[in-house]
A protein has these predicted regions:
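A broad structural signal for short, well-ordered beta-strand segments within beta-sheet-rich domains
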Residues: 34-36, 140, 211, 423-424, ...
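Intrinsically disordered, low-complexity coil segments
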Residues: 9, 131-132, 401-404
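Secondary-structure junction/capping motif
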Residues: 14, 44-50, 373-377, 557-558
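Divalent cation-coordinating acidic motifs and surrounding scaffolds
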Residues: 289-619
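Secretory targeting and sorting signals
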Residues: 1-40
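Conserved beta-strand scaffold positions in the cores of enzyme catalytic domains, especially
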Residues: 22, 27, 31, 162, ...
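Extended non-catalytic accessory segments flanking core domains
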Residues: 41-317, 321, 325-351, 432-435, ...
Length: 619
């Protein structure tokens, strides 16, 4: 299950009928500005920059315009079909774009270099709908197109570079407009989002740039035009603060259909060399996007998958790995690749907490909740790869009560190497039985092991309940709590018209973090020097309120903070290398070695979309 804002596999957007409805609704709600009666008015002889205006919303939204002229700079024959036009004679205002998208719904009949005149309606299209919080795209809809001439030179591109993009990300949203920036005058010399908005629809170019987001299944990648902006050691751009965004990131797509020219495969750290040029679009999945008419060449910089050190005899190695909806119907190749990573890249950890193990029938919604076949297929693959014969513990969830892919019943599972560590089974619990902490002579113990933490708490509604287990290594008890907190689904993107964007999903994770924190406090209250590890897909950053709640009272420390800033990430989303997966330690875990093992997130070819985490210490 993707941990950042999810999207469906189908990227084609049917919007010809939706455009007017969206705009009318937005105008009525006062979200986009303009007059709801403007559709009854006409405007003749206007230029593109008149339509674009000096804010994010056209001053002519809803109006019928006639005689709008420009040169075609790009044609899109798939997805949101249409073409871009640009006025070759720019005005003197840097806030007004000279380019504009023309939505045709069917395959356009114009070609790049055509000079055209259009009669159309000015609309504001919100990719993803009003509830997404996305900015709107100013466009012409229902066009009547007249080709005036052909073979004209395309207007010279505006170069987007480290020097042209401001370091400040966005203005603070207008409190009177609910935190929206829609009505604020653009200041392209002060803010990156304003700069990109001032180029909406314009023919732009970038020079050779570093890839910071690998090619994905939707034929897109991310680059940065700011080579030294929060650079990671492996070539990415680390995301380290809500207050300091990475303004050099830019999404790249191609206007050439894949059947004619495959999209290049790139990993983080590769170079997109030469010139990449085309109209600047705005879409639901990343905001401002260079839709390339001319696409540069990817140069492989040889990024390699990392391998962690093997634990010493007296060290306990604990790892966490989100294996992305693993179920028995997945190809054997996926199981083998994941198993090879456990053995080779993770050096066969003593305890491995897995997230997103699905039930025995996967996404088939047939009431199955057991996952023994899924786990057996995986542990068999690990043995075949030369790894240990792991044993396992888990608690089956209630059917369709823990979120994730419907029917899949994802859950956390403990694997452990019985040659190195033992598991303390104690009144094994079920999906609704809560484990608690008890004590005897200064030592803590779980009432149920494996058991779930506070499963009736509403914080876990439609979400994975934490799995707590009690292990023994060299005579010392170690408590491990495997987690998979609620996803970021529903959060607004970084390019939202709300600045700062709304992060609504954070509220649930905050409650989840408080529940886990309270449980750890119970353990530490009974055994001050207890070894407790809270591991898993926390789905939130090391600087987030979620992590702050987990660490409340000093009972936990986010081990990822022991790494240099440029190594703190487990996931790459929209060109940001960021932390989602974590291992947190109790005060009893005094000395440890931590490793975020980068084997997936930076690569176009992934076994999972997450990087596993490993912590080694001496209990």
């Amino acid at each position: 299950m993707p941990s950042s804002i999810p999207r469906s596999a189908g990227r084609t957007v049917a919007r010809s009928a939706a455009v007017s409805a969206v705009v009318a609704s937005a105008l009525a709600a006062g979200l986009l500005g303009g007059s709801s009666s403007a559709a009854a008015e006409d405007a003749a002889g206007v230029r593109i920059h008149d339509i674009q205006g000096t804010t994010r919303v056209s001053p002519l939204v809803g109006k019928q315009v006639t005689g709008v002229t420009g040169i075609v700079t790009g044609v899109r024959t798939y997805g949101s079909r249409g073409f871009w036009i640009q006025d070759p004679q720019a005005d003197a205002d840097p806030a007004t774009s000279e380019g504009l998208f023309v939505f045709t719904s069917s395959v356009p009949t114009v070609a790049v270099g055509d000079a055209v005149s259009l009669n159309a309606t000015v609309t504001e299209y919100v990719p993803g709908g009003l509830n997404s919080g996305n900015q709107s795209l100013t466009q012409l809809s229902k066009p009547v197109v007249t080709v005036l001439s052909q073979g004209n030179a395309v207007p010279a591109p505006v170069t987007i570079s480290a020097w042209s993009v401001p370091d400040a990300y966005a203005p603070e949203g207008d409190p009177a407009a609910g935190g929206s920036v829609n009505g604020l005058p653009l200041d392209p010399e002060a803010y990156a989002l304003d700069y990109y908005e001032s180029l909406e629809g314009t023919n732009v170019r970038i020079g050779s740039s570093r890839v910071v987001g690998a090619t994905d299944p939707y034929a897109e990648l991310w680059v940065t035009v700011k080579p030294w902006e929060n650079r990671t050691m492996r070539g990415g751009t680390v995301y380290g603060s809500y207050e300091s965004q990475n303004t050099g990131r830019l999404q790249i797509q191609s206007l050439t259909p894949l059947a004619q020219q495959p999209f290049p495969e790139a990993n983080v750290g590769d170079r997109l060399t030469g010139t990449t040029e085309g109209p600047l679009d705005f879409n639901q999945f990343g905001g401002y996007t260079l839709t390339a008419r001319t696409l540069g060449t990817v140069v492989d910089r040889g990024l390699e998958r990392e391998t962690t050190d093997r634990q010493h005899k007296n060290e306990l190695a604990v790892a966490t790995y989100n294996v992305e909806n693993l179920d028995p119907s997945d190809p054997q190749e996926k199981f083998d690749a994941l198993a090879k990573a456990v053995v080779d890249n993770l050096a066969s950890p003593d305890i491995l907490a897995l997230e997103e193990i699905q039930d025995n029938t996967g996404a088939k919604n047939d009431g199955t909740v057991a996952a023994d076949l899924t786990v057996k297929k995986f542990t068999d693959a690990i043995v075949a790869a030369g790894g240990p014969a792991y044993e396992w513990r888990s608690v089956d969830p209630e059917n369709n009560k823990d979120g994730g892919e419907p029917g899949g019943n994802i859950r956390q599972v403990f694997l452990f190497n019985p040659e190195r560590v033992s598991f303390t089974d104690r009144a094994s619990g079920d999906a609704t039985t809560a484990t608690a902490v008890t004590g005897h002579k200064g030592h803590a113990a779980l009432t149920v092991s494996p058991g779930r933490i506070d499963p009736a708490n509403t914080a876990w509604e439609s979400s994975r309940k934490p799995l707590a287990g009690e292990f023994v290594f060299r005579g010392r008890t170690v408590f491990v709590i495997a987690n998979h907190f609620g996803s970021k689904g529903g959060d607004e993107g970084l390019t939202s018209h709300h600045q700062p964007p709304n992060r609504s999903s954070e509220a649930k994770r905050l409650l989840q973090a408080q529940a886990v924190n309270a449980f750890v406090k119970d353990v530490v209250a009974l055994e001050k020097q207890a070894d407790v590890l809270v591991v898993g897909d926390i789905n939130d950053f090391e600087f987030s309120e979620t992590t702050r709640a987990l660490t409340d009272g000093g009972v936990l420390y986010p081990a990822v903070k022991s790494l240099p800033r440029g190594e703190r990430y487990s996931y790459v989303y929209q060109g940001n290398s960021q932390v989602l997966d974590q291992i947190l330690t109790s005060p009893g875990v005094r000395h440890f070695t931590y490793d975020s093992v980068h084997i997936n997130a930076e690569f176009a070819d992934q076994d999972s979309d997450h990087d596993p985490q490993v912590l080694r210490f001496r209990p």
